[in-house]
Amino acid sequence: MTTYHDELKQLDHTYLWHPFTQMQEWMGEEPCIISRGDGNYLIDVHGRKYLDGVSSLWCNVHGHRKKELDDAIREQLEKIAHSTLLGLSHVSGIQLAQKLVEIAPKGLKRVFYSDSGATAVEIALKMAVQYWQLKGESKRTQIASLAESYHGDTVGSMSLGYSETFHRFHKSLLFPVLRITPPHVFRYYQRLNETAALDAAIQEAEQKLDENKSTLAALVMEPLMQGAAGMWAQPVGYLHALSDICRRHGILFILDEVATGFGRTGKMFASEHAAITPNILCLAKGITGGYLPLAATLSTEEIYSAFLGEYNEYKTFFHGHTYTGNPLGCAVAIANLDLFKQESLLEKMQPRIAYLARRLREDFLPLAHVSDVRQWGYMIGIELVQDKANRKNYVPEQRIGHKVILEARKQSVLIRPLGDIIILMPPLGIGDGELATLLDVTYDCIRAVAGD
């Protein structure tokens, strides 16, 4: 007898093309088909519950079916589902812009909406380059970014964060970028301690940015944690230093907080750890609590003012998408931000962040095939290698990371790897018992797949 799951599986295999998924492999595995959510759990068509260990790709904040967020969407839906911001405005878009400016690093005054992290970054790039054109510095078109970073999958964001694995087929579309080596001891500075690596990385950044300051429009970076690049952590001093270097050399400083924003690092924005304000800030993922696609690019008044002029001066920022600033997304984003305050969410996270750090250090790091653990708040990367002593990676074809997450699924926990780096990114509202379960299952699955 054909079940509902079997029917959906057949339809999926017939019609659907999944993102970042090798479809031949996908069609050879039994799919997990989600039908609903409840709290920090996803529920499949069989009724089986899974702990959402990666916040539905790093965006869920308070859990699924959060009453206040559900209600906000219903209330907005009774008014209007969508109205454009091109030549018009709308209530929830205005109100959210005010709230974002109020909580953002001091000095960010203007909000430009879009619908994904990649588009938020793309907008920042276009703003930065056009800003310098409008200021009469036409040579300043070059962009700098951190080596092996990841900023999205549009052409501009791919150029910023080039990955040979992801983007090799699109090289001809990409523009050249000045690469700055970040202070990752495990990746780049194996012969140095953390202090020496930080000094070396800052020295390189100073030199490269100084040498290219006359042509550089901006430096773009993810603060404190390079997420999809492999959960590469940075010390606060690095963020502070790059902000200072850009300020001294007159280079716009753009922070991509698509992943790190909205509480992920333990503060509302990662830039708060260094008490700095970028010229442009990119936000997405957690902005709606993980409910609807929405993104925002915030700028200083200085940047915004450069675009003001008579129509025939062509200073307009010619960018905008159909669903930019969708009212439903803005309404649920407002409710999401209200919940941060009402539930003292950031304060409640602090002991859990300490618990995560202790478990990672005491339980995971001693494992024979765990070479490194990297954490900022609720952003965690556990790197698996074949030979820990010699830092020898597994052969990619072994799919060790993939095998770990399949094993976790058998134990009703959903996580997702980046190669052989196991990513944990739980909802910010996760409870103590659920957090312990996430760690226990991940630990057991690493041991089961890779050995002790």
Can you annotate each of these PLM segments?
Residues T2-D452:
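Conserved N-terminal phosphate-binding loop of PLP-dependent enzymes in the Aspartate aminotransferase
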